């Protein structure tokens, strides 16, 4: 567990996300199909869960993950903190910036505030996503449009994307590698733009390669999977090809930002922003007569807030724009970088407009020469990556959940910021692993809830809440709470047993009032009544209400509990 930048703690919510997966399939030949998507697998899938224990090698979560995650040499799964900044309102004290993705960790900012999140500063993940491709070595030959994959450094490096490449034979060449842009080929072609919601732009053709264009292909679009159930970082742009030492590497893609709050407001003297933009590569240097890098694609921003309060004095800019391709600073036509694709911005409500500007813009292709034609821009229509009315993070902040022993009953209490669309499934377990639903409480906006479990088992009783959003079926779990019931008595004596439905129970306390609960073997109550013990015995009359079979009997009051079985014939 890498805790260099953050120490995980018990009770902390975390996000488990499949950053990369083995999605390339058989698209590995040296042709234009290299690097296309075969099967999305689990790429972009994520879960939100809570830590119940942690040490230097292991994190234990409070519930099984709902998605499947793949761990192999072509994949990466990351666990990152979904940090709760406060138990109420919170005002930023400085800019919040994502850690740059390094191939294992980084690229994500995820914060939650139960009340009002006041932005006095910006939250950014610009260029913190998938990394851009490297420039080639100094090399010159004729135009080489048919080299799609290679291990040679004579060609520009491919940008990074949702497939983790460990094969050096795929490292360079003009083919994209999923949403990572392809590298520029000889002679002096530009790198392709990274992809995300749309496709990255084609790198510029290269020196004297107008009829044999050798620019990097743009990274693929992931629009079909950007439905709120998967989140993607922007693909890196491909690197430029050079023979004079003036090329530039591809731009990195934007990272992922997740913000959950009841209200988002701003308070500043200028403006603030929430941005996950792709990077614009620098223009070719020196004499400029080499290929430029492709732009990084925009990342993904998720804003789950019920209301916004943004005054004109402090407007908010939200953007997941693709980076523009690098320009060639030379009068002769070489290869500008392809434009990076737009990313995605996901709101849980309709698009907020008052003093808020939201953009997902496609990156523009860089100039192939000073004042000349441009390389390819990213495809699609600007701002089509803006999505509204999508709840992907459960819109409930569970402030507390406790279990307390009250005699032989368990009293569960919880407090949340409830929006009336949550169902609380109360789950019980005797081993902390296998849970069963014992009750359902519908959220009513009252924020404070309780439930009494009247038939807990002897020994440890574990409880948790499964919180389900009615509109989408999305769910998350509370931390696990438990109580312990001591076994202070012998098993309950029942006679006659088997019985026709009328029988006696031997108890230890005479003259006391008891509750008798009879359940089936699945734990469903089928009979409940109150009795007073006479001479340490209770006479139970169920009539003809019980079908033949085996039942569990519990006799309890505030200070006493016994459990036994009865067979009805």
Task: Describe each model-derived feature in a short phrase.
Residues 5-9, 546:
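Short, well-ordered loop/turn sites that connect or cap secondary structure elements
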Residues 442-463, 532-558:
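Short, surface-exposed loop/turn motifs with a glycine/proline- and acidic-biased composition
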């Amino acid at each position: 567990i890498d805790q260099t930048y953050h120490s995980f703690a018990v009770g902390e919510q975390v996000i488990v996300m499949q950053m990369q997966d083995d999605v390339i399939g058989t698209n590995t030949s040296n042709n234009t199909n290299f690097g296309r998507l075969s099967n999305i697998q689990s790429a972009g899938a994520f879960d939100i869960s809570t830590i119940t224990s942690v040490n230097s090698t292991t994190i234990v979560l409070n519930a099984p993950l709902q998605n499947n995650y793949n761990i192999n040499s072509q994949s990466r799964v990351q666990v990152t903190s979904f940090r709760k900044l406060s138990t109420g309102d919170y005002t930023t004290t400085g800019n919040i910036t994502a850690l740059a993705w390094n191939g294992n960790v980084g690229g994500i900012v995820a914060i939650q505030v139960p009340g009002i999140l006041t932005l006095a500063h910006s939250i950014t993940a610009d260029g913190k996503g998938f990394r851009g491709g490297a420039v080639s070595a100094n090399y010159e030959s004729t135009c080489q449009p048919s080299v799609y994959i290679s291990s040679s450094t004579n060609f520009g490096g491919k940008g990074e994307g949702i497939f983790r490449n460990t094969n050096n034979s795929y490292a360079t060449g003009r083919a994209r590698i999923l949403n990572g842009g392809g590298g520029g080929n000889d002679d002096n072609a530009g790198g392709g733009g990274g992809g995300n919601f749309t496709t990255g732009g084609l790198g510029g053709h290269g020196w004297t390669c107008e009829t044999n264009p050798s620019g990097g292909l743009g990274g693929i679009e992931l629009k079909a999977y950007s439905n709120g159930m998967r989140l993607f970082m922007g693909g890196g742009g491909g690197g430029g090809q050079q023979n004079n030492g003036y090329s530039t590497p591809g731009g990195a893609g934007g990272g992922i930002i997740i913000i959950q709050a009841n209200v988002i407001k701003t308070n500043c003297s200028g403006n603030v922003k929430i941005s996950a933009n792709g990077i614009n590569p620098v223009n070719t240097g020196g004499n400029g007569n080499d290929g430029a890098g492709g732009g990084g694609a925009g990342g993904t921003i998720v804003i789950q807030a019920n209301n916004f309060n943004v005054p004109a004095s402090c407007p908010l800019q939200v953007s997941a724009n693709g980076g523009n391709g690098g320009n060639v600073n030379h009068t002769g036509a070489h290869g500008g970088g392809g434009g990076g694709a737009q990313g995605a911005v996901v709101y849980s409500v309709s698009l907020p407009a008052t003093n808020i500007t939201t953009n997902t813009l496609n990156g523009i292709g860089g100039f192939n020469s000073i004042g000349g034609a441009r390389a390819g821009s990213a495809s699609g229509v600007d701002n089509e990556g803006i999505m509204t009315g999508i709840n992907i993070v459960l819109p409930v902040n569970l402030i507390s959940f406790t279990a307390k022993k009250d005699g032989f009953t368990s009293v569960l209490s919880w407090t949340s910021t409830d929006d009336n669309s949550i169902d609380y499934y109360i789950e019980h377990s005797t081993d902390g692993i296998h849970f069963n639903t014992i009750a359902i409480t519908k959220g009513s906006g009252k924020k404070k809830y309780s439930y009494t479990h009247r038939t807990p088992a002897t020994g440890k009783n574990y409880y948790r809440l499964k919180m389900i959003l009615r509109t989408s079926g999305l769910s998350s779990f509370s931390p696990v709470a438990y109580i312990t019931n001591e076994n202070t008595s012998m098993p309950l004596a029942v006679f006659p047993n088997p019985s026709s439905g009328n029988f006696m129970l031997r108890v230890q306390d005479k003259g006391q009032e008891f509750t008798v609960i009879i359940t089936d073997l699945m734990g469903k109550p089928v009979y409940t009544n109150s009795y007073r013990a006479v001479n340490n015995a209770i006479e139970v009359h169920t009539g003809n209400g019980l079908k033949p079979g085996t039942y569990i009997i519990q006799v309890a009051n505030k200070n006493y509990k016994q459990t036994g079985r009865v067979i009805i014939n």
